[in-house]
Every structure is written in C-alpha cells, then in structure tokens.
C-alpha cells in the first residue's frame, strides 16, 4: 500500500506528502510533525483507542487536524449479531459505542470536533437470514442496536492548554 500511495503521489506531482509504515500506537514520526492525519476504518480494530488518539495528538502540529472514518455502535450488539456484521462490514469487530469513541477524542485534547457523516450500516435480509432466527431478525429490525459509519473531524489546538493552569493559581 505504501508503494502504491507513493506512486499515486508521484503521478499527481505531490511533493508535500509522506507515507510511512509503522505501528499506529507508536508512530514513526516526531512530535508536532503532521498537518493532517487521515484514517479509514482502521482505528476500531485497534484495542487501545486511548493510545491511538494520544499518538495522533502527539504527531499533529498545533493547529493540525484529522479526518477519521470508522465504525461505531449504538446499543449493545449481541455476539451472534457481531459475527454477522463482521461478514458484511468487516470493520465491526473492535467497534465501541459512539459516545465512548467521541469521548476518547475529547479526552485526548482535540477541539472543534465535528461529526461529518453518520450513516447507518444496514445488513441485507439474506445475510441476516443465514445467521439469525426470524425472532432475532425481528429484534434487530426494532432498531435497539445500530451499527454506524461515522466520519469525525477534530483539531489539535494551536496552543496546548491540556496541562496548563491559571497564572498564580498555585497548581503547578
């Protein structure tokens, strides 16, 4: 994938992009280096999402931003349904609740967060029928559980005030 990305950048005559192979929880990039980070349906597969968003924060320059598309849940997905969703969406195995996902982003220190897309991932009846009983299908269709594809935008503040305190407050 890295070779292909480099080929595409060369074809487009882009000289201000860089592609690196590395561990998303320990990126091979110095702090405050990247202007933009883009990810598509990857972070939900990483067990330690706090570490990933902390690492994204570290790598982004002050004022930099990310745009991340991922799969999240609303409501508890029974394990049997999770198996079905994996067959269809492929990205559901590590999905967490949407509120938890967005909370992790806020905890990492990001600001100006915006949900740019929030689309329900629907599973066709023929796939559901292969794995679920008619009763389970009816329960799923009640809408108590939702698998969603979201795209989130957020910025690293130009000034990092996560660990700052008011002058003279004695907190430091």
Show where each model-derived region lies:
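A short beta-strand submotif of the Rossmann-like class I SAM-dependent methyltransferase core
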Residues: 38-42, 68
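Conserved SAM-binding strand-loop segment of SAM-dependent methyltransferases
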Residues: 12-26
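A short acidic, Gly/Pro-enriched loop at the edge of an enzyme's catalytic core
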Residues: 25-36
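A short His-aromatic
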Residues: 44-45, 91
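Short, glycine-/aromatic-enriched active-site segment of Class I SAM-dependent methyltransferases
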Residues: 72-92, 103
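A short glycine-rich, Lys/Arg-flanked "PGG" loop and its adjoining helix->strand segment in the class I
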Residues: 50-65
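C-terminal lobe and adjacent flexible extensions of AdoMet/dcAdoMet transferase-like proteins
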Residues: 104-172
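Conserved SAM-binding loop
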Residues: 5-6
């Amino acid at each position: 994938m890295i070779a292909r990305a480099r080929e595409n950048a060369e074809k487009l005559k882009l000289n201000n992009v860089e592609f690196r192979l590395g561990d998303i929880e320990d990126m091979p990039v110095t702090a405050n280096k990247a202007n933009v980070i883009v990810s598509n349906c990857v972070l939900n597969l990483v067990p330690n999402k706090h570490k990933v968003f902390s690492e994204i924060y570290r790598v982004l320059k002050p004022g930099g931003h990310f745009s991340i598309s991922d799969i999240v849940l609303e409501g508890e997905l029974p394990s049997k349904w999770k198996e079905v969703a994996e067959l269809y969406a492929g990205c559901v195995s590590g999905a967490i609740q949407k509120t938890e996902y967005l909370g992790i982003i806020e905890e990492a220190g990001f600001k100006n967060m915006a949900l740019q897309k929030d689309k329900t991932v629907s599973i066709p009846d023929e796939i559901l029928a292969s794995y679920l009983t008619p009763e389970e299908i009816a329960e799923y269709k009640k809408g108590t559980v939702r698998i969603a594809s979201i795209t989130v935008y957020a910025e690293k503040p130009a000034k990092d005030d996560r660990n700052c305190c008011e002058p003279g407050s004695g907190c430091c």
